[in-house]
Amino acid sequence: MSSPRSSAAAPLDDDDLLAEILLRLPPQPSSLPRASAVCKFWRSLASDPGFSRRFRAHHRRNPPLLGCFVHDFCEVRFQPTLEPPNRAPQSRFPFAIAAGDRFHILGCRHGLVLIFHDSQKQLLVWDPFTGDQHRLDIPPGFAVEKTWIGAAVLRAPGDFHHFQVVLVGNSDIQSTQAVASVYSSLTGVWDRLISTPLPPEDSGFLTMVYTGMPAVMVGGSFYWLLYGNSQEILEFDLDKRSLALIPMPVGNTRDMGEGNIWVMPAEGAGLGFLFLRGFCAQLWKRKTDCKGVSSWVLGRSIDLDKLLSLNSEMEIGYPSILGFAEDNNVVLLWTSVGIFTVQFESLQFKKLFESHDWYRCCPFEGVYTAGKNKSSYLMFLDYYC
């Protein structure tokens, strides 16, 4: 007797199963619009705001480098880096502050941009995807009138409703003290001030946070370069809520201004340090021995002229560091023949732009889903695909 025929497999129409499949599409801007072109059912799911949030959360740790917010002394604009059909239009992210106003871009992270609105003495947390803006008053205790400040923004994994801001600077009571505080949008308040001594003032030269390098997150800590009477790095441990100073392995304040030094993750893990001298890139790593003593160790040295096929005799200037994209672990390097991304562990590189004299270049990473509704998805497909 033959066994009964198994029932035919049901067509793929289960919302949950399809959602799990679509979640695993690459985090490129064209992925969901392309999926939505399959049929009305797929389009309904791909354009659903709730699914869009899930898609962004799923790819939070591997978002593409969408572009950079560049400041050319006249205005700030979004400079896209991806090729069509994944290229986010330049007009998609108009800058949050009008040209001519005084401000500093303090960094980008987790799809948010953090800005110090100097004329208002406020921090602005801006979500370019939604246009949402949150303004935060600087808490008491920071000498914002006399010194520079640094800050970093972050989100908890999968949380697109709340954020934290870490603020560091000089104490307004004792300028040779570094202070820090953390703001939570969940509570709407700043934590108590944390402090640590800075090097003493020398000939009127005060040590303060260097704003030319945005905060870099390595593990559970943020790092800033210190400018002035110091060759040190300021560390803020987010879990322990503590500040500490770490000596730089090499370099000085002049190297900061010339774009020769940057804090970054080390190869393998831990705290790293990139130092440029001419066409040579040195990769340093912070190591701790069995006695708990930490020190810097020089790892690899890389000839950038050979890696990037630069003619060292014809180059107008030496390479310099423009920025660092944390999630993609790539450094943005300026050269006279173009601006490159370099992944130093794999030695992979890509030319992004022709050379520009930009005052500031902040890499912007995130999962951009190209549209908020069905009609915008169709417009995206008509334009690019």
Segments from the language model and where they lie:
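Short, conserved recognition motifs on repeat-domain binding surfaces
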Residues: 1-385
